[in-house]
Amino acid sequence: MAEKTFKVVSDSGIHARPATILVQTASKFNSEIQLEYNGKTVNLKSIMGVMSLGIPKGATIKITAEGADAAEAMAALTDTLAKEGLAE
């Protein structure tokens, strides 16, 4: 299992476009990948789930991945969050 906490730095938070990018990245992996914010946890492969969280700038989020490719999934998601200027 891989787990990592991030701080959202994007001025718009995680809205439709970045949520889509995260879901696309997560969907490349077989692991179960969850996104947690404000006490709620959703499947990171679900665009509706991610959008339902309404994650603003400054929020602390946690991503967990469990499965055979969990480490690779976490590395890809960490890279995507950094490259897109979403979180650090």
Curated annotation (Swiss-Prot):
Pfam families: PTS-HPr. PROSITE patterns: PTS_HPR_DOM, PTS_HPR_HIS, PTS_HPR_SER. It is found in: Cytoplasm. It comes from the Bacteria. GO terms for cellular component: cytoplasm. Phosphorylation on Ser-46 inhibits the phosphoryl transfer from enzyme I to HPr. Keywords: Cytoplasm, Phosphoprotein, Phosphotransferase system, Sugar transport, Transcription, Transcription regulation, Transport. One of its GO terms (biological process) is phosphoenolpyruvate-dependent sugar phosphotransferase system. Residues 1-88 form the HPr domain. The active site is at 15 (pros-phosphohistidine intermediate). InterPro entries: HPr, HPr-like, HPr-like_sf, PTS_HPr_His_P_site, PTS_HPr_Ser_P_site. The modification Phosphoserine is found at residues 12, 46. General (non sugar-specific) component of the phosphoenolpyruvate-dependent sugar phosphotransferase system (sugar PTS). This major carbohydrate active-transport system catalyzes the phosphorylation of incoming sugar substrates concomitantly with their translocation across the cell membrane. The phosphoryl group from phosphoenolpyruvate (PEP) is transferred to the phosphoryl carrier protein HPr by enzyme I. Phospho-HPr then transfers it to the PTS EIIA domain. P-Ser-HPr interacts with the catabolite control protein A (CcpA), forming a complex that binds to DNA at the catabolite response elements cre, operator sites preceding a large number of catabolite-regulated genes. Thus, P-Ser-HPr is a corepressor in carbon catabolite repression (CCR), a mechanism that allows bacteria to coordinate and optimize the utilization of available carbon sources. P-Ser-HPr also plays a role in inducer exclusion, in which it probably interacts with several non-PTS permeases and inhibits their transport activity. Belongs to the HPr family. This is Phosphocarrier protein HPr. It comes from Geobacillus stearothermophilus.
